[in-house]
């Protein structure tokens, strides 16, 4: 039903008017300031965070301190879900969630060292660039029409990034691997691009694969009707 309504009126979640107009942007303003990007009302309008009638859109809600979505991280003892080691949930602006979730994942991303001659070379269990891209893709491209959280499952032998919502209609995994881009949340994608969090549309999956080009084990991508899982 949601999909039918969306196809009928052509308004995606991030472009729709937000029901909550009492929003604050403390964290987001700090990020914009750090990146030397203006965040005045005129800039918010040009970014689509304020509509033509002066109301906040859902894109503004996602960037606000009142964001209703979250990221849930779970750390398990081994390669199964039988026993938790730790759990943490991240709230607030999706920019805040990304920062805090990335920091948390890195605490579980063990650093190892090898030597090439006299030089020490540090390696992580998982390339930090791949972790960053998988996390950003999950946040930027998930389906925010659904209230469920992004799930990050950290096992002893792998990390799973579970994003709500499959691929945009008409796009296949082959298309994504080839760099075809059709952002579900164009306003959010543009904000992340302006903040230099993503470099360009359609390159995230390719960059994840490139970061593993010298490794035996490669990332996998599993797509369901309502989920996208990167392992």
Predicted segments with their positions:
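A structural signal for short secondary-structure junctions
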Residues: 153-155, 223-224
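Pre-DFG segment of protein kinase catalytic domains
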Residues: 161
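Glycine-rich ATP-binding loops of the HATPase_c
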Residues: 216-222
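Conserved alpha/beta core segments of nucleic-acid transaction machinery
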Residues: 226-231
